[in-house]
Amino acid sequence: MFRGASAINLDSKGRIAIPTRYRAEIIEQNAGQMVCTVDIRQPCLLLYPLKEWELVEQKLSALANFDLTHRSLQRVMLGYATECELDSAGRILISGPLRLHAKLEKSLMLVGQLNKFEIWSDAEWHAQIEQDMALGASGQFALSEELKMLSL
């Protein structure tokens, strides 16, 4: 399980170092194999351990591709999906098209989302968090039925 937000850097070759606390799980359960793709709703990337990605891939492939919305989702998420492997230094390479999509420069945030990570540019991450916090503080936060039952 991946939790927490980590400030990381993108090196000159387009690689990021996965924080040490996550590496053992990725290596033991996925042989260091991961898949990175775009988030269709946010200017960030989604980084999945291979086994988690395979579950997502099954769900995507089960969608009827005659439905234009389904087809668009498949095209974007599967089209950008790129396999990456942890190297001996715990780094993965983020492809150029993925870096461009998420506007990644040197300073990044790697954000654990339990079964996957989000990769954000530092500026986009902080702007998104400000927006999320403002929504929560506004009192206009629309709660779904599931959220109404959630106790934190």
Curated annotation (Swiss-Prot):
Pfam families: MraZ (PF02381). GO terms for molecular function: DNA-binding transcription factor activity; transcription cis-regulatory region binding. The keyword Lyase does not apply. InterPro entries: MraZ, MraZ_C, MraZ_dom, MraZ_N, MraZ_sf, SpoVT-AbrB_dom, SpoVT-AbrB_sf. Keywords: Cytoplasm, DNA-binding, Repeat, Transcription, Transcription regulation. One of its GO terms (biological process) is negative regulation of DNA-templated transcription initiation. GO terms for cellular component: cytoplasm; nucleoid. Residues 5-52, 81-124 form the SpoVT-AbrB domain. It is found in: Cytoplasm, Nucleoid. PROSITE patterns: SPOVT_ABRB. Belongs to the MraZ family. Forms oligomers. This is Transcriptional regulator MraZ. It comes from Pasteurella multocida (strain Pm70).
